[in-house]
Amino acid sequence: MFKNVCKDLKHDVLLYYIFVDNKTTSPWTEYDIQSTVDSVKVAIRWLEEQARKNNVPLKIKSDYYIGPEFTTVNRNLPQPSVQKSVTEPNLKTGLKNINMWADAIAKRVGTTLNIAAKDGIPDVKNPKNKERLIAYLRDTYQVESVALIFMVNNYFKNDISIQINTFNTEDVEFAVVSYKYPAEIAHNFLHLYGAADMYETAFRRNDSKIDQLQKLFPNEIMMEPYARKLTGLEISDYTQYLIGWKNDYNPAYESLFTDRAYNF
């Protein structure tokens, strides 16, 4: 729980998202951008309402990067899709490549934000470009916790959204989100604070555990979010423990906090 830049999901946090165009996704039109902004607002309202229901103080600020004259950042994915970018030729190399892709985008954004040389970044050797951008955002928005999301427009394609660097402390965590549904955005936002998938993904593969989770939590936001409406979904006590809203958990869940090499 609480790794890197996405710390405690309480009090003031920032959701910052960047629209990215590339040659294999649909272009971001002004309509697409505005409808995504609207979806983010819906997702935030739902998340804050879930927090209130569970007596958790939470205020999510949000903002996004857009260039002059409504221009996006152009940066091709390492492979033709998000899924292939992360998994080919293997997961280890794919994750390295998607981190380089995100750093290049953050660097480009940073050049337009006038990020100073001394902006409060941690004193670490060779800080990544994502780190510098997030340090700037922390200072500008006066928050400790920043959820960084790269939005790609895969609305008419079959692809995935994915969280990166949530299983290590070597780099800042971020998400690549393919779809503008509010549930998709809320789902991936929660990933950055420690929430775990409850369906088959790159990080969740055990069929038996997936079956158990689906029986226990059929209305959970961390189930497959594609095209689902937020109405009727919930943040289960299992997920609340992972994101820090609860200090303990039902012992019956013990085996469900691991999946092969991953500890959630």
Tell what function each PLM region has:
Residues 1-140:
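Propeptide-to-catalytic entry region of secreted or membrane-anchored zinc metalloproteases
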Residues 167-186:
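Short pre-active-site segment immediately N-terminal to the catalytic Zn-binding motif
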Residues 24-28, 158-160, 229-235:
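Short, solvent-exposed loop/turn elements at domain surfaces
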